[in-house]
């Protein structure tokens, strides 16, 4: 379909239902923004809880994206990490009925398709009852989804339970390059087992979706994406990176924020940007080691700390860095002063790091982040790990952190030069995917054709 043409009636009104979390809402919004910019007569109803509307309502967006809200029937975003299983259960059981009522109230025009996060377990069921096609958006890597869907292979190979330090290699999962057990989330063990059992219920609903969208670019994970053609009977499309790259070119007439002004004063490639994400956090003891190791490294840094900003500022007073509570991450990563990205390896951040051409220092915390770190370091070869030198250590010590930060930010070493060359190459691939005739735009048009022809 020519994007300049008006979309058919089957694709006039999209209802978007993201899973209520920052790492899920952002890519869903980026998808909707790309579509309304590409298809002039498309309208989107973007559904969030009342709490989330307070968080994102003021953010700029196209006029043809409108918010609708569900009541706050789930735990607050501010406390969901304290009982993650309870939060998932609340999303599964408390939001379906109010979403149905909202859906039935939308009639000008009536919804033509539902975009739902894969983790919104009831979306396919709701769409089926109303004969509205549902498109599933997977916001993590295609590789981790292939791992999840082939989890039975771990059991048959005797790898269901393992120690995080195990070196044994898994080489039998479609779409997954040979990977050590320690680089896989322990999905059958303890707390992770409980999380996986709840997630698996959502994966069982995938065959009922009209299609599956990935936030990645095909070129970044082609083996994993190709593996889905034999695993699923629905079409899959890689339409990423679903990051806000289009907004980088928007001119801002307001005064530049202080952190950008500070970056302008730093030498090229000298700043380590640090973000540990917006959901999980490390222990106080580990944070103390990070702070002291960073200070002793003598490296310039910009640290975004969502919560605990004042405490960090005090601990790092007199160092070569700046601590802020929020920043425009993609803009920071694309700034010439930034030479490295300390990341928790959430997939959105990983995609932004790749797009920016900045090497990544991987410090994963949980779940898909563990495998993302392996992909960054071993598959794409655009980063290093922060890890224990001794397997029995509970904490990564300040000395280890100091040394790896210095090594990572050394632009003159052969290792540093090769890592940065690879990061630049991967950036070109990522940017090429979203260029005018790139794979992601081609896939978006194919996806729209599929939806309109089968509706």
UniProtKB/Swiss-Prot annotation:
UDP-alpha-D-glucose binds at residues 278, 327-329, 344-352, 366-369. Transmembrane segments: none annotated. CDD domains: GT1_Gtf-like. Keywords: Acetylation, Glycosyltransferase, Transferase. GO terms for biological process: regulation of flower development. It holds the Pfam family UDPGT. InterPro entries: UDP_glucos_trans. Its EC number is 2.4.1.-. The modification N-acetylmethionine is found at residue 1. One of its GO terms (cellular component) is cytoplasm. This is UDP-glycosyltransferase 87A2. The gene is UGT87A2.
């Amino acid at each position: 379909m020519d994007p300049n043409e008006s979309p058919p009636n089957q694709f006039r009104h999209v209802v978007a239902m993201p899973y209520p979390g920052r790492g899920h809402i952002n890519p869903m919004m980026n998808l909707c923004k790309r579509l309304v910019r590409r298809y002039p007569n498309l309208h989107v109803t973007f559904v969030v809880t009342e709490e989330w509307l307070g968080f994102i309502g003021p953010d700029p967006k196209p006029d043809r994206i409108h918010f609708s809200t569900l009541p706050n029937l789930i735990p607050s975003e501010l406390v969901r990490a304290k009982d993650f299983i309870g939060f998932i259960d609340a999303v599964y059981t408390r939001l379906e009925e109010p979403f149905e009522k909202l859906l039935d109230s939308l009639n000008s025009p009536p919804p033509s398709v539902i975009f739902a996060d894969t983790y919104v377990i009831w979306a396919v069921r709701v769409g089926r009852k109303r004969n509205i096609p549902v498109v599933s958006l997977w916001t993590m890597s295609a590789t981790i989804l292939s791992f999840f869907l082939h989890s039975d292979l771990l059991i048959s190979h005797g790898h269901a339970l393992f120690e995080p330090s195990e070196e044994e290699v898994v080489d039998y999962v479609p779409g997954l390059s040979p990977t050590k057990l320690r680089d896989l989330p322990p999905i059958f063990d303890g707390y992770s087992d409980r999380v996986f059992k709840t997630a698996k219920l959502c994966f069982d609903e995938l065959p009922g979706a009209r299609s599956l969208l990935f936030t990645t670019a095909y070129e970044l994970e082609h083996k994993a994406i190709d593996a889905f053609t034999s695993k699923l009977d629905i079409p899959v499309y890689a339409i990423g990176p679903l990051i806000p790259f289009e907004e980088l070119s928007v001119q801002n007439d307001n005064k530049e924020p202080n952190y950008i002004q500070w970056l302008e004063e730093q030498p090229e490639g000298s700043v380590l940007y640090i973000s540990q994400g917006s959901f999980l956090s490390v222990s106080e003891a580990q944070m103390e080691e990070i702070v002291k190791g960073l200070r002793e490294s003598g490296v310039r840094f910009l640290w975004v700390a969502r919560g605990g900003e004042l405490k960090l500022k005090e601990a790092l007073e007199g160092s070569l860095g700046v601590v802020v509570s929020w920043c425009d991450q993609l803009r920071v990563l694309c700034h010439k002063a930034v030479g490295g990205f300390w990341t928790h390896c959430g997939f959105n951040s990983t995609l932004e790091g790749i797009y920016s051409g900045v090497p990544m220092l991987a410090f994963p915390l949980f779940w898909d982040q563990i495998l993302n770190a392996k992909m960054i370091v071993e598959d794409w070869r655009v980063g290093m790990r922060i890890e224990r030198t001794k397997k029995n250590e509970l904490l990564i010590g300040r000395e280890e952190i100091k040394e790896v930060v210095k090594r990572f930010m050394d632009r003159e070493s052969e290792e540093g030069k090769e890592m940065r060359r690879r990061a630049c190459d991967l950036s070109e691939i990522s940017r090429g995917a979203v260029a005018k005739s790139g794979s992601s735009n081609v896939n978006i048009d194919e996806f729209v054709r599929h939806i309109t022809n089968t509706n």
